[in-house]
Amino acid sequence: MNQKLFSVRTGPLFLLAVLCCLLTFSSRLAGWDASTVHDRAGRDAFVGHHLTKTSPPPFAFIYGGKASTGVIGKWTVSSEERTEGPKLIRTVVYADPSTGLRVTAVYTIYKDFPAVEWVVRFKNTGRADSPIIEKVRACAVSFPGFPGTASASGPVMLYRARGSSAARSDFGPIDEPIAPKAEIRFGPVAGRSSDTNALPFFNVATSEGGVVAAIGWSGRWEAVVGRKGADPRSIDLTAGMAETRFKLLPGEEVRSPSIALLFWKSDDRMSGHNLFRRFVLAHHMPQTGGKPTPLPINHGVGFGGPFPCNEYVCATESYAIGMIERLHQFGIEPDACWIDAGWYENATGQWWSGVGTWTVNRKNFPRGLKPVTSAAKKLGQGFVVWFEPERVYEGTWLDREHKDWLTVLPGNANRLLDLGNPKALAWLTDHISNFIRDEGVTIYRQDFNFDPAPYWKAMDAPDRVGIAEMKHIEGLYKFWDALLDRNPGLLIDNCASGGRRIDLETTSRSIPLWRTDYQYYEPNGYQCHTYGLHFFLPASGTGNGDPRKYWFRSAMGGAVVMGWELTGSFNLQAAIEDVAEFRSLRAYLYGDYYPLTAYATGDDAW
């Protein structure tokens, strides 16, 4: 089966489609019993085979020219356990006494879901450079006797999705059979985790059950799913960074991508998808009071204006406050107001010209953004402010004052702020956190509009391939964690050219409120995006510029970003009804997801 929750155009039919989801959600498991879908036996067998002190680990690498499978068993091994709520956390440390390499695997075994996760850290505790560590695979496992393969009653299928490329086909589902002696290899096109080719979530399924896998890495990754072994009933899964070949300096430490596996059993693969969606809601989504944080209905408070205005370059304090008051005057009450790119100094001509100077343009906002955010706060509304901190444009403040923090490519005006540099990371964390506090920001919106992979490659020596990427990505996670810790209640909006950095780690810390840069407000494309992304992720947002019912309903995805111009031709009554309807239905979008029709991108399908 495939799904179009929002494919119908008429009100009653639409509500009927939503009610299908509503009834499932409201009874939590109407239609299927969770206990019959949880493959705890499969999960427990996996734990016994891989996640203990004495078992071969679920990861692999080559160390000093030798496969880890042949040497790690000779190292010193220790382990410890602790419990955190519904999680058993087991830490296993593998130490090479001859070189001082310490490999630490942190395994998380969930009690409330048939799921496991792990992440691996490498540290050189010796006094000399380590031997070369290469071809690191954070996941390198086989599933012998995979459910359904013995009976040959149906093929082994790989259900995955495209990433984002500002196209109607963004997040489109890809269903591929895995034939015996074959394998499927996939990953993003470059240095952002869900760029164009692949989303780092996938379901390996048969007619009896399967495993949903997720990769937590916000850079370059690669996964391979195959049946190339001698036993066609065995499924092989490897995943990790796209390229690694590095030595570690004395005292240096790096981490791998994180991996999650969820084991399910059913003759309907949607049971696996829905169980994974629930797992994400429970353990990998921002929480408020122990429940998934309600996503906001947003509205912009500035429009581009006549040439040469673009984005929010020409936005002003008076205009923004006037827009907030105008929305309130006409009964449109968003949860949060929104200022996008262009509010900062040096944003002359084009919005990107000031990226790297993160101070407010005092010509347009003489008192900073606080008067604007305060106007929203008086109405009970939060406030979204856009940043793109990893990109630094030539001539901006960071480019002038801290060139030592930047990586520059010849002939390219964009520089990369190195989040693996402790000084750069500390400055950025303090500066943005203080800005959030002082200016009254409640939703921090982070964009990332260029490919970092060439910069990381330029930073790496031949014997340090992957180091720049690993340190930058870990710096990103430290940055976001610090913002959340210092600003209780803060929500992070993960943009990255619209949905190009969605993975398990970013999903755990943020929400993509603007999931694609596909042509703004086009409803049929938005239907396609909802269709594909919701197989794995229950919460995302997109834009709406037209209050007509089909247009607005096509943008429903947990959050919505409105850009309505309240002029004489604007249908105010429809807009008020849209907001009220969305509020009444929003919770049900977190329910189970059941495809009603086949996936199609043509206009005639919608």
Predicted regions and their residues:
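Bacterial N-terminal signal peptides that target proteins for export
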Residues: 2-15
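Bacterial N-terminal signal peptides
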Residues: 12-24
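Polysaccharide-binding surfaces and accessory modules of carbohydrate-active proteins
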Residues: 31-228, 232, 242-244
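Active-site-proximal substrate-binding groove within the catalytic cores of carbohydrate-active enzymes
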Residues: 32, 476-606
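Glycine-rich, aromatic-flanked loop segments that form ligand/cofactor-binding clefts
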Residues: 50-75, 200-219, 266-300, 330-341, ...
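Active-site and adjacent substrate-binding regions of carbohydrate-active enzymes
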Residues: 120-122, 374-376, 423-504
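Short Pro-Gly-centered flexible turn/kink motifs
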Residues: 246-265
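Aromatic-lined carbohydrate-binding/catalytic grooves of carbohydrate-active enzymes
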Residues: 294-433, 439-443, 452-455
